Amino acid sequence: MTPHINAKKDDIAKVVLMPGDPLRAKWIAEQFMEKPRLVNEVRGMLAFTGQYKGKTITIMGHGMGIPSIGIYSYELMKFYEVNTIIRIGSCGALQGSLNLQDLIIAAKAWSESIYANDMGVEVPADKILMASPQLVELAKKTANQLQLAFHEGLVFCEDAFHQIRKDVLKLAQEKHALAVEMEAHALYANAMLLNKQALTMLTVSDSLVTHAALPAEQRQATFKNMAILSLEMASQLV
């Protein structure tokens, strides 16, 4: 147990799927898993462990932003000995070639955040951290098997949701970042630090280019494909 997770060690599987919203974790568990059990509810950050195609998997929310996912992913990897975390979330498109509902496999994440430095991770000069190559390849293979189109590349991991400095977003576009989100860089930093595996997969919910946005009811339906993709991946990793 930790100050933020009260599950017993054996209650958490070695592969954890992490949406930002704990209610989305609940939805995935109830919709797709057999016999899901609530194993954490500290601070409302729900976690469920259950079976998918006979394999034990945990689904847990991580909250919003680098500090939040930094805490939860670190504690899962460090104290619960989780081997793999796959973040499944939403993002804002930074390139005009991306459409709403597009799937992104975030092979790389760039951020101006100091989180990785504070954790003692050796950050390269370009401030880009990598997802686990094995997970990137597994995501692509599984997406192809499910006939899901996807984009693979760099995402910009932002600290401020209500970003005022437009030059930062312009710089992200110049770096050819596909989209902006708020957690991948910290997740990859923790995986590097603790020698674990991590990947972020995202669905485009908004566009900072066209200013289009998915209504709430469509976001849930679109998220379904990514949830199934992540579960199929997890079942191959356990």
Curated annotation (Swiss-Prot):
State any GO CC term.
cytosol
Active site positions, chain numbering: D206 (proton donor)
Molecular function per GO: purine-nucleoside phosphorylase activity
Provide the GO biological process annotations: purine nucleoside catabolic process
The signal sequence is: none
Q: Its family? A: Belongs to the PNP/UDP phosphorylase family.
- Organism source for this protein? Mycoplasma pneumoniae (strain ATCC 29342 / M129 / Subtype 1) (Mycoplasmoides pneumoniae)
**Residues binding phosphate:** G20, R24, R43, R87, I88, G89, S90
Concerning Pfam families, the annotation shows: PNP_UDP_1 (PF01048)
Question: Under what name is this protein listed?
Answer: Purine nucleoside phosphorylase DeoD-type
Site annotation Important for catalytic activity: residues: R219
